[in-house]
Amino acid sequence: MKSNKTNWIIGAIAVLVLPLILQSFGNAWVRIADVALLYVMLALGLNIVVGYAGLLDLGYVAFYAMGAYLFGLMASPHLSDTFPAFAAMFPNGLHTSLLIVIPLAAVLAAALGALLGAPTLKLRGDYLAIVTLGFGEIIRIFLNNLDHPVNITNGPKGLGQIDSIRIFGLDLGKNLNIGDFQISSVTLYYYLFLLLVIGTVVVCYRLQDSRIGRAWMAIREDEIAAKAMGINTRNMKLLAFGMGASFGGVAGAM
């Protein structure tokens, strides 16, 4: 027990110190760690759908894209530049706070996840995988071509002039100076992503042994037996799709 506690403490210290060491070799190394943390969050969200509920979702990255575009639209002047009526209300763009974007990204992705799950409730295995793969490809094509007749996503060019993330007045897009020591912007992002990953791990850990988590695992092992035991498999599947997608949406917004 003492050995496990020591390992946890050493691991926590290593994770906290890692970006400070990496930034001495260049910000590119810290940026790799940033992206890795986002992929960890994506994997944890996907694990809810595939690992807990046993639903082979190959279009999961679509929720990542939706979260990214949501943040891009809400933290840039693109909508004001495209729609005159919108520009009259917000001449400089929305520039929405991260504290608002995160729950919105989670809700939007969860709604899309449930929307994807609804027509696939009776599909299993390879058939479910093919449908979800098609969904992911549809979203990619849709976003790439949503620049006409009304320019919403700016097509393959993407959205520009997106704000850096601000938290309680701290601009993560700028280096932070503490005395003679400077913490780079990418390192600040690292700690934000690390905090979100820890939150995701806690939620997933709590779900695993909860009533919902056990219901998902029962469906994964034998859906017919789970239904015979009184589990509402339809609602549980939709919940798995929605909850898993919400983590992908938040990761994309980052």
Model-derived segments and spans:
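Transmembrane alpha-helices and adjacent helix-loop boundaries
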Residues: M1-M254
